[in-house]
Structure formats: structure tokens, C-alpha cells
From Swiss-Prot:
Gene name of the encoded protein: nagB
Organism placement in taxonomy: Bacteria, Pseudomonadati, Pseudomonadota, Gammaproteobacteria, Pasteurellales
Entry EC number(s): 3.5.99.6
Top-rank EC class of the record's enzyme: hydrolase
Entries under Pfam families matching the protein: Glucosamine_iso
UniProt protein name: Glucosamine-6-phosphate deaminase
Site (Part of the allosteric site): 151, 158, 160-161, 254
Activity-regulation annotation: Allosterically activated by N-acetylglucosamine 6-phosphate (GlcNAc6P).
Function: Catalyzes the reversible isomerization-deamination of glucosamine 6-phosphate (GlcN6P) to form fructose 6-phosphate (Fru6P) and ammonium ion.
Keyword tags: Allosteric enzyme, Carbohydrate metabolism, Hydrolase
Amino acid sequence: MRLIPLKNDEQVAKWSAQHIVDRINAFNPTEDHPFVLGLPTGGTPLKTYRELIKLYQAGKVSFKHVVTFNMDEYVGLPKEHPQSYHSFMYNNFFNHVDIPEKNINILDGNTPDHDAECRRYEEKIKSYGKINLFMGGVGVDGHIAFNEPASSLSSRTRIKTLTPDTLIANSRFFNNDVSQVPKYALTIGVATLLDAEEVMLLITGHQKALALQACVEGAVNHLWTVSALQLHRHSIVVCDEPATQELKVKTVKYFTELEAYAIHSVI
């Protein structure tokens, strides 16, 4: 595992966006051989999307031959609802770059057969061979996508019941009314994430400090979904200083020295 400890969330956004661009350009994608990118929603990746848009506008990258798969979507929320993850992705990213509509993949939370939709999604991913890079965020309790604490580390795309903590956390997007937050979501599984060639998690803010500690210093534990990243052969955690508050000083020092070149690339 690589840990990139940066000063603030602005640096996290710049570093992660540049890393995605570098990976896409090094891959040299074509229509017949596209780069496959996994994407999250939520507050943490917003600044990364803004940086990606800037890099696209500056001519540093094209998304014409990039295929995307999003992590999750609420069940029962219309696609056009302002808080659906469809709306989030189009408003904050897809509408601002040159990605073809046919290359965008987001789970359909309104399908009558959720199990069939989840199987279709897994099969679609496999049709491309693998996801080349999956970017993700992490919840306060260490969940990735909607893989809540105690999710199976061998899980695949499926329907999940959201925990009370997640409902409360997400109520800020629904006028702080928990009753308006969908109770279920379709989500990729932990094993789906770990199948990706590379996984990059963004962890920012002091409220995520325990999750970062579980990810880097803790044992692999299904109660901390994020700890499964330790099992991945090519994983990167990009974090800011507030998120490192629960890490041992020597841990931060070790990775700061180890990743000195990567860190200075955004300073």
C-alpha cells in the first residue's frame, strides 16, 4: 500500500486528479482498447472532479476513450432527482468533459429486478477485462461505496440496506430530513473493488482519522471495510494532514519520507 500524506484537501484533489490523468495518458486508450475508470460520488471527490475538468480544459487529457463505472446508486430515487448519483455525476463531471454517453455506466436503482441489474453490472465490468483504476472515498465508519461495516470482504454488486449512521450522514443532502433518504442502495461489492488493477482512496478531514488508522495500521476486519485495501496488490491512499491524527507519528514519518517525490509534486 502507498500512503500519500499531503497538507490539505486541495493538494489531495490536485494529486489524485493528476494521477488519473497520468494513468489515462500512459495507457494511450483507443475506441477498441479503452481505459476503464471506476468513480465515486460524495463530498470528498468533488474537488478532484473540478481538477480533472481543469486538466481537460487545458488539453492535458481526453475522456473520449475512457469507460466509467460508478460505485453505487440509491434505490427508488429517479435519475433526474437532484440527489441521485446520476445527477451528481453529470452535474459535477460528465457534462464538462468529452466522455461519450455510451461509455458511462451507473447502476439503475429503479429497475424492477435489482438482482438482475447487479449481475448485469458485474458482467459489463468483466466484458472490459477489468477496471484499470478505481477511485473511491471512505465514510467515517470506514465504509466504501455502500459496503457498510460487517459487509463481506468477498461481496459482489448487490442491494444493501443503509445503516442509521449513513442515513443521518446523507440527510444533509435531503434538507436534513432522514425520512427522505432512500433506505436501500445498489453498490459494488468489496471484491468488485479489489478486482480493479489499481485502487486509489481519498481520505480527508479529522472525522475520517479513525478510518484511515484502520486502513493503514489496523488488522483486516470486516467491521472496517476500508481495511480490505491491505489485501490489494496496488493500492494508494491519498490523505490530508487532519486525517492522519490517529496514525502513529512514525507511520506518517515513514510514508512522508518514502513518498517525498510524490508529495513535492503538488507543493
